[in-house]
Every structure is written in structure tokens, then in C-alpha cells.
């Protein structure tokens, strides 16, 4: 969804919109979510925003033994079950501005409709409906829309946009995800981008030995948000130089995502244009480490209240914000396209 915004909402040219409209009619819709999602706020609603639940699933569907993808993530027979590998909430305010909050997959919550507590990512075992209900009920945040992409979809999108540049001061690796980076800046293809985004056992070479990032999933969230910043900013530069070259990206996104039945990607992207012009802000949900039995989990920290209140529509945006898109570049792109 964020990449659709970058291509459509920021590009803005009429040709881009026509191409996008033709593509988005083919996007796969997930039946059954209407009963779970919050009512859409009208023009006079007290809640001045819409929240998108963005999900990266760890589904291996379509990956077969012996393929190039198998070496990185395995196939559906090797890795049983299906969980949400990445969970984010994108808040789009009616008067402009947007914020992205990442939820750690090990967050310990009550799973909606079960009366039992588990890690939040396990809710996806019972489908998108259960996950959306669990996120909404456990955090008190209304969810208005749902967007999902799986491993193969993520890889395809990155390859179609020509890769994403990531910089690291030291050599980095993750023997579990397949990540292997040299010091400096390099453009990641789909395979390596997936290894980077999935990395929970991230190590850096420190003079004479490999040092593990002790933050595990919290470190992964930080890297994912960095990746989103670079992907969006890279797309902005590409669109600025060639607004009509967005067709391949639009096709990749629409072929790779599943969305709720009532979401109109074009209208959503256009509504988010003003937000992109002001800059996208990213947050990590404050949590602390705990154990349940022998399992390591994360629980909500006390200082999460102000952030959750903002996403619930009950308080102002937290004061510590990080701008992830360059507003000046967005303005230049819109002006060049003749839209605004």
C-alpha cells in the first residue's frame, strides 16, 4: 500500500492514474473482512483518520523445492502453518499527515474470540479476520482497511522497482534468513531484500568476530522501517525523473497484494498524497521483555499509552517523530506532473 501511494498518489500524472485504475480492478479481495473492520468515518465523524492494517505473511505458497526461492525461505511442506511475519498500522489523517506503527510479532495478547493469550502473529493462523480482530481488540485501535503481501509478492515488488539501496557501516549477515551484506551502500534485489526484512538473527562483523544484535525482533522492526524509507524515497526519485514509467511497479503491487473488499486503492492513494507531502512518520510500539513458561515474549510498556491513544484518535501525535519521506521532493514531483 505504501508503494502504491508513492507511485500513484505522489506521481499524480493522468497517465499514471489511468494505468493504475486498469490494474487495481484485478487486485485479490479477502471476503469476510467487512464484518470485522470498523465503520468508515464520514466527513463529520469525530474520528478524523483511517487506519490500514498492513500485513506481511510468511506464506510459502507457490514456492517449490529446488527453486531459487526455496534456498531462502523453504516451501509450504517444510514450514507448516501460516503466520503474520510483519504487522504495521498506517494511520492516514483526513487533514493531512500519516504515521506508521510497527507491532512486534512476539507481542503477547489475547487472541480475539478464543479467550486465550498467544503471540500476536499466531492470530493469522485462523485467517486475516482473526488477526484484524485481535489487533483491534487488544490495542483498542479501529481498523478500517486491510492490505497483505506474502514472501513471493514482496520479492517481486522489490525486483520490479529495480531494487532498494541499503547502507551499513559493517559487514552484516543472518545465517537463518540468508542475509549477507558487505560494508557500504548496495542495492538489494528481491531475494536479499527479503532476507534483510526478515532478519531476526542479525549479526555485524566487529573487528575479529560476529556480534549478534540483541534486540532481535525490535531490531528487525527498525531495519524494516529503514527499508521502507529507502524504498519510498527511491521511488520518489524515479517518478520525478520519469512519471510515466510507473506501470511495472503498479502491476507488481496489484499482482502481489490482497486487500479488503471495500478498499479503493486509487482513492486511498490520492487521499494519502497530502500526507506524503508532509512526510511519513514511523513509530515502534514500546514494549518490554517477559517470559510465559519457557517462551520469550513482549508485553506493552507503560509508555505505549500515548502512542496507542494517538492511533485510537484519543490524543495528539507523540512529540518524537521521524520523517521518512522528503517533502521537498514530493512537492517537486507533484508540480512536475501538473497535479496538486
Language model region names:
Residues 1-95:
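Entry/capping segment at the start of metal-dependent catalytic domains
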Residues 47-50, 82-87, 95-98, 103, ...:
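Extracytoplasmic
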Residues 62-67, 116, 252-340:
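C-terminal solvent-exposed extensions
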Residues 75-79, 117-125, 140-145, 183, ...:
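Second-shell loop/turn segments in exported
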Residues 80-84, 114, 122-130, 148-152, ...:
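Soluble non-cytosolic domains of exported or imported proteins
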Residues 84-86, 117, 128-136, 151-155, ...:
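Extracytoplasmic/secreted envelope proteins and their assembly/folding machinery
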Residues 93, 120-182, 269-272:
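Amphipathic, coiled-coil-like alpha-helical scaffolding segments used for oligomerization/assembly
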Residues 159-240:
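Flexible, polar/acidic helix-loop-strand segments at domain edges
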